Amino acid sequence: MPRSLKKGPFVDDHLLAKVDVQNEKGTKQVIKTWSRRSTIIPDFIGHTFAVHDGRKHVPVFVSDSMVGHKLGEFAPTRTFKGHIKDDRKAKRR
């Protein structure tokens, strides 16, 4: 179920504060964050976030098409190695 419109999008306060400081200074440094649950808002456009995937920080450059999504959607946590090909020679042995 989506979040109520009267509540507005959820963004961690510390993350919003870091973006506001960079917007005031006019800098675009990478912002390291563990907040995968934060919603991307229009203030984030043009910034690069290093989103934690459980092991390392994945750089995510925010564009206008990402607004409304969560930061965690762009940093996958699982690595898909592919399905094992059906090997008939190995089955005979």
Swiss-Prot record:
GO cellular component, one term: small ribosomal subunit
One biological process term in Gene Ontology: translation
Pfam families with a match to the protein in the record: Ribosomal_S19
Keywords in alphabetical order: Ribonucleoprotein, Ribosomal protein, RNA-binding, rRNA-binding
UniProt xrefs under InterPro entries: Ribosomal_uS19, Ribosomal_uS19_bac-type, Ribosomal_uS19_CS, Ribosomal_uS19_SF
Spans traversing the lipid bilayer: none
GO molecular function terms listed in the Swiss-Prot or TrEMBL record: rRNA binding; structural constituent of ribosome
Family of this protein: Belongs to the universal ribosomal protein uS19 family.
Purpose of the protein: Protein S19 forms a complex with S13 that binds strongly to the 16S ribosomal RNA.
Protein name in the entry: Small ribosomal subunit protein uS19
UniProt source species: Rhodococcus erythropolis (strain PR4 / NBRC 100887)
Gene name tied to this protein: rpsS
